UniProtKB/Swiss-Prot annotation:
GO cellular component: cytoplasm
InterPro entries: ITPase, ITPase-like_fam, RdgB/HAM1
Protein name according to UniProt: Inosine triphosphate pyrophosphatase
Sites where the protein binds Mg(2+): 44
Organism: Sorghum bicolor (Sorghum)
Cofactor note: Binds 1 divalent metal cation per subunit; can use either Mg(2+) or Mn(2+).
Cofactor(s) needed by this chain: Mg(2+); Mn(2+)
One biological process term in Gene Ontology: deoxyribonucleoside triphosphate catabolic process
This enzyme's EC code(s): 3.6.1.66
SUPFAM superfamilies (UniProt xref): ITPase-like (SSF52972)
Binding site for ITP: 16-21, 56, 72-73, 89, 148-151, 171, 176-177
Residues spanning the signal sequence: none
GO terms, molecular function: dITP diphosphatase activity; ITP diphosphatase activity; metal ion binding; nucleoside triphosphate diphosphatase activity; nucleotide binding; XTP diphosphatase activity
Catalytic activity: ITP + H2O = IMP + diphosphate + H(+); dITP + H2O = dIMP + diphosphate + H(+); XTP + H2O = XMP + diphosphate + H(+)
Amino acid sequence: MSAAARVLPKAVTFVTGNAKKLEEVRAILGSSIPFQSLKLDLPELQGEPEDISKEKARMAASQVNGPVLVEDTCLCFNALKGLPGPYIKWFLEKIGHEGLNNLLKAYEDKSAFAMCIFSLALGPGEEPITFVGKTAGKIVPARGPNDFGWDPVFQPDGFEQTYAEMPKSVKNEISHRGKALALVKEHFASASYTVQSDNSA
């Protein structure tokens, strides 16, 4: 795509109002990508997860007038053909962990996958680039600390612990978010973006 390194007018803005999510992203990215965080009220869209993510990135880029990274997370139950999917946040708010388990009560298949989509838009009017991470697992009765979304009910394949029970370092290594951010990191390393310094200390 490009030979010369792209100079970004300012650090990438990661759009989130979720402190736990921000903490996790900071832990995974470290200092590899200069970014700041900002809570924006973007309309909640419906559609395919990747399309939703791209559209949110476009809207955010025009609001901040610069490069943005937005994230969308889905929890997809195979027995329900991928639902709740991108609507997991509302399902969780309305019916809680027990309700999520009850959705699968009539089904033998408790398998699910967690999916994370990051969309990077380098500025207003730029086509967003998406990075997708997936982790397969199953839905179980809630176990572990109850302070981060649906982590207590998702047990990744190959592990005896739910996301909530795992040490953060282990979760970040294998999670849908960790996998998507590894691709974001890779992209930044190969694209050689540099952030324009304005010399204001």
